[in-house]
Amino acid sequence: MSEKDKKELTQECEELKEKYKELEEYAKRLKAEYENYREEVAREKRELIKNANEYLILKLIPVLDDFERALNQGEKRDAFYEGVKMIYKKLLNVLEKEGLTKIHVGEKFDPFEHEAVERVETEDVEEYTVLEVVESGYKFHGKVLKPAKVKVAVKPRKKEAEKVEKPSDEKE
Protein backbone atom coordinates (compact mmCIF):
# COMPACT_ATOMS: atom_id res chain seq x y z
CA MET A 1 0.00 0.00 0.00
CA SER A 2 1.38 3.31 -1.01
CA GLU A 3 1.74 6.37 1.17
CA LYS A 4 -0.94 8.09 -0.89
CA ASP A 5 -3.39 5.23 -0.28
CA LYS A 6 -2.65 5.36 3.45
CA LYS A 7 -3.38 9.11 3.56
CA GLU A 8 -6.62 8.62 1.64
CA LEU A 9 -7.69 5.81 3.96
CA THR A 10 -6.75 7.85 7.04
CA GLN A 11 -8.66 10.84 5.70
CA GLU A 12 -11.65 8.64 4.82
CA CYS A 13 -11.48 7.08 8.29
CA GLU A 14 -11.47 10.55 9.91
CA GLU A 15 -14.41 11.60 7.75
CA LEU A 16 -16.30 8.45 8.73
CA LYS A 17 -15.52 9.09 12.43
CA GLU A 18 -16.82 12.65 12.06
CA LYS A 19 -19.93 11.40 10.26
CA TYR A 20 -20.42 8.80 13.02
CA LYS A 21 -20.22 11.52 15.71
CA GLU A 22 -22.75 13.65 13.80
CA LEU A 23 -25.12 10.70 13.46
CA GLU A 24 -24.65 9.81 17.13
CA GLU A 25 -25.51 13.40 18.16
CA TYR A 26 -28.48 13.35 15.80
CA ALA A 27 -29.70 10.09 17.36
CA LYS A 28 -29.35 11.59 20.87
CA ARG A 29 -31.35 14.67 19.83
CA LEU A 30 -34.05 12.47 18.27
CA LYS A 31 -34.24 10.39 21.43
CA ALA A 32 -34.56 13.53 23.60
CA GLU A 33 -37.21 14.97 21.28
CA TYR A 34 -39.10 11.68 21.39
CA GLU A 35 -39.01 11.65 25.22
CA ASN A 36 -40.24 15.25 25.31
CA TYR A 37 -42.99 14.34 22.84
CA ARG A 38 -44.06 11.36 24.98
CA GLU A 39 -44.16 13.55 28.09
CA GLU A 40 -46.20 16.21 26.26
CA VAL A 41 -48.67 13.61 24.96
CA ALA A 42 -49.04 12.16 28.46
CA ARG A 43 -49.56 15.67 29.89
CA GLU A 44 -52.16 16.47 27.22
CA LYS A 45 -53.92 13.17 27.91
CA ARG A 46 -54.08 13.94 31.65
CA GLU A 47 -55.42 17.43 30.88
CA LEU A 48 -58.03 15.99 28.50
CA ILE A 49 -59.18 13.51 31.14
CA LYS A 50 -59.28 16.30 33.73
CA ASN A 51 -61.39 18.47 31.40
CA ALA A 52 -63.74 15.57 30.66
CA ASN A 53 -64.09 14.95 34.40
CA GLU A 54 -64.71 18.65 34.95
CA TYR A 55 -67.53 18.57 32.41
CA LEU A 56 -69.10 15.52 34.08
CA ILE A 57 -68.73 16.93 37.57
CA LEU A 58 -70.21 20.24 36.46
CA LYS A 59 -73.28 18.31 35.26
CA LEU A 60 -73.51 16.42 38.58
CA ILE A 61 -73.40 19.50 40.82
CA PRO A 62 -77.15 20.22 40.37
CA VAL A 63 -77.79 16.66 41.60
CA LEU A 64 -75.83 17.47 44.76
CA ASP A 65 -77.87 20.65 45.14
CA ASP A 66 -81.12 18.67 44.84
CA PHE A 67 -79.90 16.20 47.46
CA GLU A 68 -79.09 19.06 49.82
CA ARG A 69 -82.53 20.59 49.30
CA ALA A 70 -84.18 17.21 49.94
CA LEU A 71 -82.11 16.68 53.07
CA ASN A 72 -83.00 20.13 54.37
CA GLN A 73 -86.72 19.40 53.89
CA GLY A 74 -86.84 15.83 55.23
CA GLU A 75 -87.66 14.55 58.67
CA LYS A 76 -84.32 13.74 60.31
CA ARG A 77 -85.54 10.53 61.99
CA ASP A 78 -87.19 9.12 58.92
CA ALA A 79 -85.57 6.03 57.29
CA PHE A 80 -86.07 7.55 53.82
CA TYR A 81 -84.19 10.63 54.93
CA GLU A 82 -81.31 8.50 56.19
CA GLY A 83 -81.18 6.62 52.87
CA VAL A 84 -81.05 9.83 50.85
CA LYS A 85 -78.41 11.19 53.22
CA MET A 86 -76.28 8.06 52.70
CA ILE A 87 -76.55 8.32 48.89
CA TYR A 88 -75.66 12.02 49.04
CA LYS A 89 -72.57 11.32 51.16
CA LYS A 90 -71.42 8.54 48.82
CA LEU A 91 -71.87 10.71 45.72
CA LEU A 92 -70.05 13.61 47.36
CA ASN A 93 -67.23 11.29 48.46
CA VAL A 94 -66.75 9.95 44.90
CA LEU A 95 -66.69 13.46 43.45
CA GLU A 96 -64.27 14.69 46.12
CA LYS A 97 -61.88 11.86 45.24
CA GLU A 98 -61.93 13.14 41.64
CA GLY A 99 -60.96 16.67 42.73
CA LEU A 100 -64.25 18.36 43.65
CA THR A 101 -64.21 20.46 46.82
CA LYS A 102 -67.05 22.29 48.47
CA ILE A 103 -66.43 26.01 48.90
CA HIS A 104 -66.24 26.59 52.61
CA VAL A 105 -67.94 29.83 53.39
CA GLY A 106 -65.72 32.07 55.48
CA GLU A 107 -66.51 35.12 57.49
CA LYS A 108 -66.24 37.65 54.66
CA PHE A 109 -67.95 37.74 51.28
CA ASP A 110 -65.56 36.84 48.44
CA PRO A 111 -66.90 37.72 44.97
CA PHE A 112 -64.67 35.06 43.38
CA GLU A 113 -66.26 32.27 45.44
CA HIS A 114 -69.67 33.65 46.42
CA GLU A 115 -72.71 35.01 44.64
CA ALA A 116 -74.82 37.33 46.78
CA VAL A 117 -78.47 36.45 46.28
CA GLU A 118 -79.77 38.56 49.14
CA ARG A 119 -78.61 41.56 51.14
CA VAL A 120 -79.69 41.60 54.77
CA GLU A 121 -79.59 44.94 56.55
CA THR A 122 -78.22 44.46 60.04
CA GLU A 123 -75.93 46.08 62.58
CA ASP A 124 -75.44 42.82 64.51
CA VAL A 125 -72.44 41.70 62.44
CA GLU A 126 -69.69 43.34 60.39
CA GLU A 127 -70.66 44.50 56.89
CA TYR A 128 -70.16 41.94 54.06
CA THR A 129 -70.25 38.99 56.45
CA VAL A 130 -71.83 35.86 54.98
CA LEU A 131 -74.94 35.21 57.05
CA GLU A 132 -76.30 32.11 55.34
CA VAL A 133 -75.52 29.74 52.48
CA VAL A 134 -78.54 29.43 50.20
CA GLU A 135 -76.84 26.99 47.80
CA SER A 136 -73.40 25.38 48.13
CA GLY A 137 -70.55 26.29 45.80
CA TYR A 138 -67.90 23.97 44.36
CA LYS A 139 -64.33 23.99 43.03
CA PHE A 140 -62.68 21.41 40.78
CA HIS A 141 -58.90 21.21 41.23
CA GLY A 142 -58.95 24.77 42.61
CA LYS A 143 -61.07 26.23 39.80
CA VAL A 144 -64.48 27.61 40.83
CA LEU A 145 -67.15 25.66 38.95
CA LYS A 146 -70.10 27.10 40.82
CA PRO A 147 -69.98 29.95 43.34
CA ALA A 148 -71.80 29.55 46.65
CA LYS A 149 -75.08 31.48 46.72
CA VAL A 150 -75.19 33.41 49.97
CA LYS A 151 -77.00 36.02 52.03
CA VAL A 152 -74.71 38.92 52.94
CA ALA A 153 -74.91 41.45 55.77
CA VAL A 154 -74.96 45.13 54.83
CA LYS A 155 -75.31 48.28 56.89
CA PRO A 156 -78.89 49.50 57.24
CA ARG A 157 -79.82 52.42 55.03
CA LYS A 158 -80.55 55.67 56.80
CA LYS A 159 -84.09 56.92 56.55
CA GLU A 160 -84.68 59.63 53.98
CA ALA A 161 -85.80 62.06 56.67
CA GLU A 162 -82.52 61.69 58.50
CA LYS A 163 -80.40 61.86 55.34
CA VAL A 164 -81.82 64.96 53.72
CA GLU A 165 -83.22 67.78 55.75
CA LYS A 166 -85.51 70.00 53.78
CA PRO A 167 -84.57 73.70 53.86
CA SER A 168 -87.24 75.91 55.41
CA ASP A 169 -89.06 78.38 53.17
CA GLU A 170 -87.84 81.91 53.85
CA LYS A 171 -90.28 84.79 53.35
CA GLU A 172 -89.00 88.19 52.45
UniProtKB/Swiss-Prot annotation:
Pfam families: GrpE (PF01025). SUPFAM superfamilies: Coiled-coil domain of nucleotide exchange factor GrpE, Head domain of nucleotide exchange factor GrpE. GO terms for molecular function: adenyl-nucleotide exchange factor activity; protein homodimerization activity; protein-folding chaperone binding; unfolded protein binding. Signal peptide: none annotated. Its main location: cytoplasm. Gene3D superfamilies: 3.90.20.20, Head domain of nucleotide exchange factor GrpE. It is found in: Cytoplasm. Belongs to the GrpE family. InterPro entries: GrpE (IPR000740), GrpE_coiled_coil (IPR013805), GrpE_head (IPR009012). This is Protein GrpE. PROSITE patterns: GRPE (PS01071). The keyword Isomerase does not apply. One of its GO terms (biological process) is protein folding.
